[in-house]
Structures are given as structure tokens and as C-alpha cells.
């Protein structure tokens, strides 16, 4: 049975989008958002399974067992709204006024999830698919992303579950609906460098071991390397230092330790292991003239990937163009998403709403964009099950 604030007319995406936004599902809190999704999908004939890991809950739903299987993927968790009083509309009020839907998650990405569900209802109204449709909805995308899509995919693989293509509903469009489809993403590596010395008075440097010169030397070596010139359609890889800290507000004390943090966004010319080895090799070249140590704490949060242009991406472009009049570009820029996990299991692309206000105060989207996105998703389902045989 559907929740009381959700219309039985699932072909209309707005009531479902509002019901989801009214759940304050700030990572890792679900607040009933997945219950709303499960109720809607069960009404459409999906078999639903929940996958709780740690503090996070996740939902996998499938309708049918035959191939090909088309997977919709997304997340119901949202970032905190910040100061509620700074919003023109309540962040979890889901008010629709003058053709605009307001609320945290409207753009990223509860509006797109509602469009996915509505598109399935509209598609099923025309007949049964020659294959299967599935949903993977996580509550851990905006957070560490450890207990979300990645963990569910691993569990599904252990159970023998497979799918053939995936569309993620991230807000890929920077300006207007139909701008861009994400056909790949850069990889991401985080590193914390720590040089440990010995604290002392600046007037007696012989009694101290200053870690700062060694840290600056190491950062200089890392920054001196041009990683690449870009690999189309990827932009050049970049290393950005994000902080340098010594925890020392004074001018007469040599600090005991110095720390720097940086991130590398890398294209398919690199992988996480090779970059990690390079960082460690540069660390090994630093010759400390005192009895200290240098540590590099490296975490690769995602590898670069690309879904090559082909029948799947062409289908997506054709359907977007048919509904918007714009031919979307296939791009790979921006941050990471859960597509970095999905690409290990099936070809994946991303297309959703306009992201201009995502994560901001007064997040909002035109209701007409949600309707158009529903029409695009419906057209994609029709084309997919017509042109992609088992």
C-alpha cells in the first residue's frame, strides 16, 4: 500500500518527488525515503529487497527475470540544508509554486528518481518489456559511499544478479535540460602527507627538527610533474593541494609535524595504483637530515572510466534530442558519482535534471523539467527494449 501522501497515479512524477523531498534523508538517515520508493515500485510489480549495511539502507528492485535488464540507479540521501531560515521555502516542504518545485533533493536527485518511476508506469501502460527493469537506490551517495551502491553491487554479484545497461539520474545538465550526458568520469585520489620532526624554539634550531622544508620539497616535486595533456574526451589530470597545516599559531616555535592534503582528478591515462606508486616513490626521494619520518596516507575513491560512444549512448542522445530539441554532448567532467562503481558491472551513463541549484540554499527545479525528463526516460525504455535484444 502506498504511503498516505503519495498519489496512486505514478505516471505523474510530481507527487512522488514531493513525497521523497518531505523525507529529510540527510546521509546516513533514511527518514522513510526508501519506504516511499519501495511502496511505489511494488505497486508497479517490482520485487524489492533491502540491503542495509552499517548505518545505511539501500533498495534493489527488479521487475522480470529475462535479459536484457535495464537498470535505473540513484540515491535518496541528500546533503544538509544548512540554515533553514536562509531558505525562501522550507527545505523539506516540497512546495510546488508557480511551476517550480522547491526543496533539498529536488535537483539532486529525488526529482529524477520520481521521473524514473513515472517513466516505468508510462512504459508499462503500452505493454510488457522484452526483458527486465531494475532499480538500485542507495542512501549513501552524498556521504562516504562505502555502504551504498558499491556494497549492494558486490552483494548482488554474489547472488548472481546481472544487468546489461545502466542509467544514473544525476543532475548532469549545467544550464538547461538536454545539455550533457555523462559517459564517463575522472578518477579521484586523496592523499595526506605527514612529516614528523621535533618541536623546539626558533632561536635554537639545533635542538629541533623542522618538518616544514621537507614537506615543501615533497610538494614541489609532486606539483612539478605535468600528469598529462588530456585524453579526449577527458580534460588533463590535475593535482590540487587543498591544505597545508602545522597547527602552530606562533612565530617562535618550530612545529613538531607538518601535514598537507591533496587530491588528484585523473583521466584514463592513469589508474589509482600507478599514481599511488608514483607518490610513494617521490616520498622515498626526500632525504631527511634528521631522525624524522614521512608518511603518505593514500585513498583511491574511484577509477577513471569511459563508456565508449555507441548504440547505448546514441539511444540516449536521440531520446533527449527528441524531447528537448537539443543534442546533448557526451562529457566526462565534474566530480565523481556512483557510476564509478556501476561501470565495473555494465555500461553506464548519467542523465538527469539541471544541477544549477544542487547543494545550495533554495534548491529547486522547474516542474516542467521533471515532466520532460519523465518523457525522455519513457522514450529511452521504449527504444531500449526495441533495439537491444536479449
Swiss-Prot record:
InterPro entries reported in the protein's UniProt record: ArgE/DapE_CS (IPR001261), Bact_exopeptidase_dim_dom (IPR036264), DapE_proteobac (IPR005941), Peptidase_M20 (IPR002933), Peptidase_M20_dimer (IPR011650), Peptidase_M20A (IPR050072)
Keyword NADP found: no
UniProt pathway: Amino-acid biosynthesis; L-lysine biosynthesis via DAP pathway; LL-2,6-diaminopimelate from (S)-tetrahydrodipicolinate (succinylase route): step 3/3
Active-site residue list: 77, 141 (proton acceptor)
Group of enzyme by EC: hydrolase
Subunit structure, interactors included: Homodimer.
Role noted for this protein: Catalyzes the hydrolysis of N-succinyl-L,L-diaminopimelic acid (SDAP), forming succinate and LL-2,6-diaminopimelate (DAP), an intermediate involved in the bacterial biosynthesis of lysine and meso-diaminopimelic acid, an essential component of bacterial cell walls.
Keyword Amino-acid biosynthesis: yes
Name by which UniProt lists this protein: Succinyl-diaminopimelate desuccinylase
NCBIfam families associated with the record: dapE_proteo, PRK13009.1
Reaction(s) catalysed by this chain's protein: N-succinyl-(2S,6S)-2,6-diaminopimelate + H2O = (2S,6S)-2,6-diaminopimelate + succinate
Names of the cofactor(s): Zn(2+); Co(2+)
Amino acid at each position: 500500500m502506498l504511503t498516505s501522501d503519495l498519489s496512486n497515479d505514478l505516471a505523474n512524477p510530481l507527487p512522488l518527488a514531493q513525497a521523497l523531498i518531505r523525507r529529510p534523508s540527510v546521509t546516513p538517515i533514511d527518514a522513510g525515503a526508501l519506504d516511499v520508493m519501495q511502496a511505489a515500485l511494488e505497486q508497479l510489480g517490482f520485487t524489492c529487497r533491502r540491503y542495509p549495511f552499517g548505518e545505511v539502507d539501500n533498495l534493489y528492485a527488479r521487475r522480470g527475470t529475462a535479459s536484457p535488464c535495464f537498470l535505473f540507479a540513484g540515491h535518496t540521501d541528500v546533503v544538509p540544508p544548512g540554515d533553514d531560515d536562509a531558505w525562501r521555502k522550507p527545505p523539506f516542504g516540497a512546495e510546488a509554486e508557480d511551476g517550480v518545485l522547491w526543496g533539498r533533493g529536488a535537483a539532486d536527485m529525488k526529482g529524477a528518481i520520481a521521473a524514473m518511476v513515472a517513466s516505468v508506469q508510462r512504459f508499462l501502460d503500452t505493454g510488457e518489456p522484452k526483458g527486465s527493469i531494475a532499480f538500485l537506490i542507495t542512501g549513501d551517495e552524498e556521504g562516504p559511499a562505502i555502504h551504498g551502491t558499491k556494497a549492494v553491487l558486490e552483494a548482488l554479484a554474489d547472488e548472481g544478479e546481472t544487468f546489461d545497461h545502466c542509467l544514473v539520474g544525476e543532475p548532469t545538465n549545467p544550464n538547461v535540460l538536454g545539455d550533457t550526458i555523462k559517459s564517463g568520469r575522472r578518477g579521484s585520489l586523496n592523499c595526506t602527507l605527514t612529516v614528523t620532526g621535533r618541536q623546539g624554539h626558533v632561536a635554537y634550531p639545533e635542538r629541533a627538527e623542522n618538518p616544514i622544508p621537507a614537506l615543501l620539497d615533497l610538494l614541489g616535486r609532486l606539483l612539478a610533474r605535468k600528469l598529462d595533456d588530456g585524453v579526449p574526451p577527458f580534460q588533463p589530470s590535475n593535482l590540487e593541494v587543498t591544505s597545508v597545516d602545522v597547527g602552530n599559531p606562533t612565530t617562535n616555535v618550530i612545529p613538531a609535524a607538518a601535514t598537507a592534503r591533496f587530491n588528484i582528478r585523473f583521466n584514463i591515462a592513469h589508474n589509482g595504483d600507478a599514481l599511488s606508486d608514483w607518490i610513494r616513490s617521490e616520498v622515498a626521494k626526500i632525504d631527511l637530515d634528521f631522525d624524522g619520518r614521512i608518511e603518505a596516507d593514500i585513498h583511491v575513491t574511484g577509477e577513471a572510466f569511459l563508456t565508449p560512444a555507441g548504440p547505448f549512448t546514441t539511444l540516449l542522445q536521440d531520446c533527449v534530442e527528441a524531447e528537448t530539441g537539443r543534442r546533448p554532448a557526451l562529457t566526462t567532467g565534474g566530480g565523481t558519482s556512483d557510476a564509478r562503481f556501476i561501470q565495473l558491472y555494465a555500461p553506464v551513463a548519467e542523465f538527469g535534471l539541471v544541477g544549477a541549484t544542487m547543494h545550495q540554499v533554495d534548491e529547486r527545479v522547474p516542474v516542467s523539467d521533471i515532466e520532460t525528463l519523465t518523457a525522455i526516460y519513457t522514450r529511452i525504455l521504449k527504444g531500449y527494449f526495441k533495439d537491444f535484444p536479449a
